Amino acid sequence: MIVRTLAEAEASDRRVTSENWESVRLLLKDDNMGFSFHITTIFEGADFEMHYKNHLESVFCMSGEGEVETLADGKVYPIKPGTIYILDKHDKHVLRATKEMKMACVFNPPVTGKEVHDESGAYPLEAEAIVD
């Protein structure tokens, strides 16, 4: 059994910060569960494009407000607490936060730990692993 607290993870290398977000990676590839689980904060005013070419992601909004736009068809979906969006087709998308958003995110395949978006908006398939 693996037991971790959010507070412990926030105070460790499992907390990864970028310009638009901060992600606390609670479950990673080395945990051998077949997916990774993150609590991610999207900063207020963030507006950025992503394209997970190597991963599928589902995102559940716990707090805050914003929107996600799928670039293939230009559809815009509001995000508020209780909303889930699922990037089941490696959807190229834009995420915008009108208020800081706290999100629960699941990635398949799992991330290794220190991934940040590359110039195309994707995470690499393999990155440096976090070692506890």
Swiss-Prot record:
It comes from Saccharophagus degradans (strain 2-40 / ATCC 43961 / DSM 17024). Pathway: Amine and polyamine biosynthesis; ectoine biosynthesis; L-ectoine from L-aspartate 4-semialdehyde: step 3/3. InterPro entries: Ectoine_synth, RmlC-like_jellyroll, RmlC_Cupin_sf. Catalyzes the circularization of gamma-N-acetyl-alpha,gamma-diaminobutyric acid (ADABA) to ectoine (1,4,5,6-tetrahydro-2-methyl-4-pyrimidine carboxylic acid), which is an excellent osmoprotectant. GO terms for molecular function: ectoine synthase activity. GO terms for biological process: ectoine biosynthetic process. Belongs to the ectoine synthase family. Its EC number is 4.2.1.108. Keywords: Lyase. This is L-ectoine synthase. It is an enzyme of class 4 (lyase). It catalyses: (2S)-4-acetamido-2-aminobutanoate = L-ectoine + H2O. Pfam families: Ectoine_synth.
